[in-house]
């Protein structure tokens, strides 16, 4: 992580620096162990194909975690992630790049907290959105230092 980001330095319309991941089949097996999601579509190619899929697919919750990392990397240690939502629009495949992106929609003060609302999404290598959602972050303000 670089320097701490402050509320005053954020503008509506700003892009969040993208987070690029390349999940592997091994990572999917490890994720299954950690999450308890042992659905074979995430590690068994033949099983996935028998269910009409082109092959093994990445867990949706792993994509969700990438979106969470996008936000926590961006807001820094003094920021706090207040809300994170995600809905799945497509599939990601192991070995392919997943790019998490975001854009600031608005910033406001509520209950004394400096909040930033963002649209967030994940893209496959074709630039198609495979997941999208929103996040609200509580940011430190220079005026409160």
Regions picked out by a protein language model, each given a short descriptive name:
Residues 1-16, 94-145:
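HotDog/MaoC-like acyl-thioester-processing domains
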Residues 2-80, 144-145:
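Hot-dog-fold acyl-thioester-processing enzymes
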Residues 73-100:
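Mid-chain, well-packed structural core segment of small domains
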């Amino acid at each position: 992580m670089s320097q701490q980001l402050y509320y005053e330095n954020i503008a509506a319309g700003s892009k969040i620096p993208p987070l690029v991941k390349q999940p592997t089949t091994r990572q999917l097996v490890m994720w299954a162990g950690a999450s308890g999601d042992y659905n074979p579509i995430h590690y068994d190619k033949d099983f996935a194909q028998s269910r009409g899929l082109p092959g093994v697919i990445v867990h949706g919750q792993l994509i969700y975690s990438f979106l969470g990392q996008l936000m926590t990397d961006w807001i820094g240690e003094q920021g706090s992630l207040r809300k994170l939502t995600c809905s799945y629009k497509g599939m990601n495949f192991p070995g392919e790049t997943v790019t998490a992106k975001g854009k600031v929609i608005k910033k406001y003060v509520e209950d004394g907290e400096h909040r930033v609302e963002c649209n967030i999404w994940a893209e496959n290598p074709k630039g198609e959105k495979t997941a999208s959602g929103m996040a609200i972050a509580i940011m430190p303000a220079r005026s409160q230092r």
